[in-house]
């Protein structure tokens, strides 16, 4: 895994710095686990096949988001996302706006754009009592957006916790679609 990360980082740097094409063609199937390019996760709705393909490195000028944007949130990687897809107590949430999601997403994730999350806390297991949310029985939320420079998930996390969602029930896949 360390070698894969180092190789991917090197490809991104060389592509960004020198404008050269990466040595792995876009669309090439990538290994998820050692000698495994496909993982099948059993969910309540049936099996979901997980694959990864090479994408062009992100070249946006965004600001790198903190690994822990709100105290108490858990940073995670691809393995935890895959495990969460099979966990009935968890939800994998794509917090990007709909225009980004239609270009591709993590199979089995639900769409909950960051601008809508506060109005949709009920879908995450919270109940509304008057004007306040009670999130004591909330699901574990495994959330992602476009990648390390994307502010959409961190914005949603701040709004969620401000409304009473427990930070320790939020798992942040900061690598997002850039790493996926």
Question: Where do the language-model regions lie?
Answer:
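Positively charged n-region of N-terminal signal peptides that target proteins for export
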Residues: 1-4
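Bacterial N-terminal signal peptides
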Residues: 6-15
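Flexible, polar/low-complexity N-terminal or interdomain linker segments that lie immediately upstream
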Residues: 18-92, 98-103
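Short helix-loop-beta junction
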Residues: 63, 104-109, 163-165
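Mid-length scaffold segments of soluble, non-membrane domains
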Residues: 74-139
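Catalytic cysteine-centered active loop of the rhodanese-like fold, especially the PTP/DSP P-loop
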Residues: 126-180
């Amino acid at each position: 895994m360390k070698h894969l990360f180092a190789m991917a980082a090197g490809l991104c740097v060389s592509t960004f710095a020198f404008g050269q094409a990466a040595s792995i063609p876009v669309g090439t199937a990538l290994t998820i686990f050692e000698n495994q390019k496909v993982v099948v996760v059993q969910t309540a709705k049936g099996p979901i096949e997980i694959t990864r393909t090479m994408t062009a490195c992100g070249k946006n000028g965004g600001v790198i988001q903190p690994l822990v944007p709100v105290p108490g949130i858990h940073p995670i990687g691809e393995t935890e996302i895959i495990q969460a897809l099979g966990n009935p107590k968890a939800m994998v949430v794509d917090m990007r706006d709909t225009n980004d999601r239609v270009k591709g997403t993590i199979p089995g994730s639900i769409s909950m754009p960051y601008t809508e999350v506060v109005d949709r806390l009920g879908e995450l297991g919270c109940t509304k009592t008057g004007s306040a949310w009670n999130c004591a029985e909330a699901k574990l939320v495994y959330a992602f957006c476009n990648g390390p420079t994307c502010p959409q998930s961190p914005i949603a996390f701040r709004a969620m916790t401000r409304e009473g969602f427990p930070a320790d029930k939020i798992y942040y896949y900061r690598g997002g679609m850039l790493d996926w």
